[in-house]
Regions:
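Short, conserved helix/loop micro-motifs enriched in His/Cys and acidic residues
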Residues: 26-60
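A general structural signal for well-ordered alpha-helical packing
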Residues: 1-5, 42, 69
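Feature targets compositionally biased, intrinsically disordered low-complexity regions
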Residues: 13, 19, 28-31, 39, ...
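Catalytic cores and adjacent binding grooves of peptidoglycan-active enzymes
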Residues: 49-138
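Extended, low-complexity, intrinsically disordered C-terminal regulatory tails
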Residues: 1-32, 83-95
Length: 138
């Protein structure tokens, strides 16, 4: 998942940063149910502006990140994206429906993205996918 995350951040043109990926924990509010973060298939990409912090201080990050998120979801099959939660809008996108649906999520300033396990755990497959969608990084 590390390679997938690195490319996601790189291609966001600085509007997203890793707000949390691999951590051993249960799903919030569901004791005993392991989180997809703990399985190494989820990342939270934030657009929050953190003053005077390189890589975390882009102006209008949400507005700038939305077209990028749309592009990722348009290429979800290639990139292995299964789920995207947009906490600011309390909505989720799932690969089996291919559209946004209102949800009941706590407010937040990040996107939670889950990737299929095969893609998440294969840097080579992730590289091929990102190269196909965005081109090879020299």
């Amino acid at each position: 998942m590390d390679y997938w995350i690195t490319r996601a951040i790189h291609h966001s043109s600085g509007c997203l940063w890793n707000n949390g990926s691999y951590i051993i924990r249960d799903v919030k509010g569901k004791p005993g149910t392991i989180s997809n973060h703990a399985k190494g298939v989820a990342v939270d990409l934030s657009y929050r502006m953190v003053a005077n912090t390189p890589g975390k201080s882009i102006y209008m990050g949400r507005q700038r990140s939305l077209p990028y998120i749309v592009k990722l979801l348009e290429n979800a099959d290639t990139l292995g994206i299964e789920l995207c939660i947009d906490y600011a809008m309390s909505r989720s996108w799932k690969c089996d429906r291919g559209t946004w649906k209102a949800g009941n999520f706590a407010a937040g300033d990040w996107y939670h993205i889950e990737v299929n396990p095969v893609m998440a755990h294969s840097p080579e497959l992730a590289k091929q996918a990102w190269d196909k969608v965005f081109g090879v990084i020299p």
